[in-house]
């Protein structure tokens, strides 16, 4: 079954975040340490509290956190993997900017530092209506292929092809996926 086009792929930005603190003995001198567990915890709670955007779907997820070296040691390093998504590239940008501010502020609040490494990104996409209709017509009439009744689907995923499609459409062309 041919699906002539799609829409609904969310724009996304993915980061690896490394928090740096200062190790100390949790029982002997906890005040000497700079606990990244506090920074990470503060960041996580506030990331999930980002106000959602009225212009469309928005998402945030903390996928993994790895931290600590022992139960009696103030953690001095943590790695967190996060992603934000938005129904449009603009909504994703809103989520990204909010997330970066939260992460940097959480680190600073607890006397830690952080570095953020961009691990991936994709823009939102929407197939060109006229091209979707043409693909549908060619598949049905010329190639005699079955065509899905629903021409598009919202799957909540993201697609790298969005960069190419958006560039083609910005130049006046048509694109479908």
Locations of regions flagged by a protein language model:
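Alpha-helix C-cap/termination motif
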Residues: 53, 109, 141-142, 167, ...
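Short, low-order "capping/linker" segments at domain edges
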Residues: 125-142
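Generic hydrophobic alpha-helical scaffold/packing signal
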Residues: 83, 96, 100, 104, ...
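Midchain, well-structured core segments that form catalytic/ion-binding scaffolds
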Residues: 1-127, 156
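C-terminal helix-coil-helix/basic helical segment that borders enzyme active sites and/or dimer interfaces
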Residues: 112-116, 140-155
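Zn-dependent metallopeptidase/amidohydrolase metal-coordination segment
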Residues: 148-177
């Amino acid at each position: 079954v041919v699906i002539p086009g799609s829409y609904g792929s969310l724009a996304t930005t993915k980061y690896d975040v490394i928090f740096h603190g200062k190790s100390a003995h949790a029982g002997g001198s906890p005040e000497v340490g700079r606990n990244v567990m506090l920074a990470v915890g503060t960041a996580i709670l506030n990331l999930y509290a980002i106000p959602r955007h009225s212009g469309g779907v928005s998402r945030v997820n903390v996928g993994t956190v790895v931290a600590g070296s022992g139960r009696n040691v103030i953690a001095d390093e943590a790695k967190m993997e996060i992603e934000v998504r938005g129904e449009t590239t603009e909504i994703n940008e809103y989520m990204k900017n909010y997330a970066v501010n939260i992460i940097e502020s959480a680190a600073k609040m607890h006397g830690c530092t952080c570095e953020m490494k961009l691990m991936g990104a994709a823009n939102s996409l929407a197939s060109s209506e006229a091209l979707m209709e043409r693909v549908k017509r060619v598949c049905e009439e010329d190639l005699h292929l079955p065509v899905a009744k629903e021409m598009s689907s919202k799957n909540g995923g993201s697609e790298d092809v969005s960069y190419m499609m958006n560039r083609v459409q910005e130049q006046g062309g048509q694109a479908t996926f």
